């Protein structure tokens, strides 16, 4: 079977979930200049064709810097913000205008050899962002540098309803007719919040947020962000992370940070279970919970391969439905990726941990430990004093977690009478 067939099948739940959703996408000026920009445009067009309502916000910092240099002007910053005097504003307007035209031209391609063939996109832009001056801070006059006051929510939604891609530039206008230079991150964040967007997607040079060892941080809650901001200082990763967290606190469902340098990063983030960037979300991306009857199908899919290998005892759908209240599960993006069950042994103060299973793709984490802790907590709450486990393949894992070798004779009689001598499972116990 071709690989793309399998990919499409796995992506179909996300295609359905994203249809008619509003995504605000922020692409900095560096991303527009990058060789991968054409692929990003193709991916945005694909999202549009799948029914996603798209608002694209572009940056222009390197383009502004180039125009300042060409005119022999020195850029001035204070606390990371550009000071936009009259001469600088001319460069800003020039850079933003040319960049907007270039982006619109890319989105208008309809060549037979292009992935955009037949797309017939309409790009809409205009005076959709109202701004105000930052003014004077700490004695520094920012002149024409501004901040977003509001976005035209009704106007943008009307354009989205008409199947247009809305393009927002880092310029804002005041009721008095002034033009202000804005940070594209600010425009994107405010647009996402004011529109009640389902997602804010932020492009950066890196795959997402990297920890102190250079390893990708895949998911965060907004309350975890300040610690990372302190570590990052004032670099661009910090700006993106701050914007992502602010959007979530403002009611945006999820914020994502992905790389503009990696071909397909946007699609990987949106149409695969683990993504390829960093997710910031208020709700838990993955959680441990008690199983419900709706989980039976997912449990069967998880444990069937292990049953075929003889690692787990076979359980039919009927058995799982009858015993579903004994199970705890780890759910990730709607998929059951791990499970464990607790059975109280009749006429005793002991319980049995059974059917501990983790999807092979997720065994690198601590999900087994999380489930064990959950089962032990449940056992103590039920007044149980001892936890038994019978295993054929994972004895060392349990011994490393405080279980000690036991025997059939140590099992309560109700469980000992059911012991399968042909299976010859090793028995371990742990005092609670």
From Swiss-Prot:
Reaction(s) the record says it catalyses: L-glutamate + acetyl-CoA = N-acetyl-L-glutamate + CoA + H(+)
EC number: 2.3.1.1
Keyword check for Metal-binding: no
Gene Ontology molecular-function annotations: L-glutamate N-acetyltransferase activity
Keywords, alphabetical: Acyltransferase, Amino-acid biosynthesis, Arginine biosynthesis, Cytoplasm, Transferase
Signal peptide: none
GO biological process annotation, one example: L-arginine biosynthetic process
Keyword Amino-acid biosynthesis: yes
Main location: cytoplasm
Domain N-acetyltransferase, first and last residues per copy: 286-425
Location(s) in or outside the cell: Cytoplasm
Any single Gene Ontology cellular-component annotation: cytoplasm
Pathway as given in its UniProt record: Amino-acid biosynthesis; L-arginine biosynthesis; N(2)-acetyl-L-ornithine from L-glutamate: step 1/4
Similarity-based family: Belongs to the acetyltransferase family. ArgA subfamily.
Protein name: Amino-acid acetyltransferase
High-level lineage: Bacteria, Pseudomonadati, Pseudomonadota, Gammaproteobacteria, Pseudomonadales
């Amino acid at each position: 079977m071709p690989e793309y067939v399998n990919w499409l099948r796995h992506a179909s739940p996300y295609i359905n979930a994203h249809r008619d959703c509003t995504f605000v996408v922020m692409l900095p000026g560096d991303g527009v200049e990058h060789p991968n920009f054409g692929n990003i445009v193709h991916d945005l067009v694909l999202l549009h064709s799948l029914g996603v309502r798209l608002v694209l916000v572009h940056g222009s910092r390197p383009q502004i810097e180039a125009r300042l240099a060409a005119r022999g002007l020195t850029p001035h910053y204070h606390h990371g913000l550009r000071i936009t005097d009259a001469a600088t504003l001319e460069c800003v307007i020039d850079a933003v205008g040319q960049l907007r035209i270039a982006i619109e031209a890319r989105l208008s391609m309809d060549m037979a050899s292009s992935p955009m063939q037949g797309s017939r996109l309409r790009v809409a832009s205009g005076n959709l962002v109202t701004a105000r001056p930052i003014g004077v801070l700490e004695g520094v006059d920012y002149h024409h540098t501004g901040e977003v006051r509001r976005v035209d929510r009704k106007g943008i939604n009307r354009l989205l309803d008409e199947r247009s891609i809305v393009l927002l530039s880092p310029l804002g206008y005041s009721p008095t007719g002034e033009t202000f230079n804005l940070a594209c991150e600010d425009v994107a964040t405010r647009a996402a919040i004011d529109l009640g967007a389902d997602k804010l997607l932020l492009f950066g040079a890196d795959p997402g947020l990297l920890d102190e060892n250079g390893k990708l941080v895949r998911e965060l809650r907004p309350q975890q962000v300040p610690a990372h901001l302190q570590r990052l200082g004032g670099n661009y990763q910090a700006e993106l992370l701050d914007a992502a967290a602010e959007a979530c606190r403002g009611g945006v469902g999820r914020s994502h940070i992905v790389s503009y340098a990696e071909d397909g990063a946007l699609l990987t983030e949106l149409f695969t279970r683990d993504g390829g960037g960093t997710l910031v979300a208020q709700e838990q991306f993955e959680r441990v919970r008690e199983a419900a009857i709706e989980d039976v199908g997912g449990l069967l899919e998880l444990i069937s391969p292990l049953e075929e290998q003889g690692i787990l005892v076979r359980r039919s759908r009927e058995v799982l439905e009858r015993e579903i209240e004994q199970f705890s599960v780890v759910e990730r993006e709607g998929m059951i990726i791990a499970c464990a069950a607790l059975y109280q042994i009749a006429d005793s103060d002991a319980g049995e941990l059974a059917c501990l299973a983790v999807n092979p793709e997720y065994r690198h984490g601590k999900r087994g430990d999380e489930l064990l802790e959950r089962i032990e907590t449940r056992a103590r709450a039920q007044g149980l004093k001892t936890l038994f486990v019978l295993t054929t393949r994972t004895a060392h894992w349990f011994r490393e977690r405080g279980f000690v070798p036991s025997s059939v004779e140590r099992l309560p009689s109700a469980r000992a009478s059911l012991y399968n001598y042909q299976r010859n499972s090793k028995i371990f116990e742990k005092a609670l």
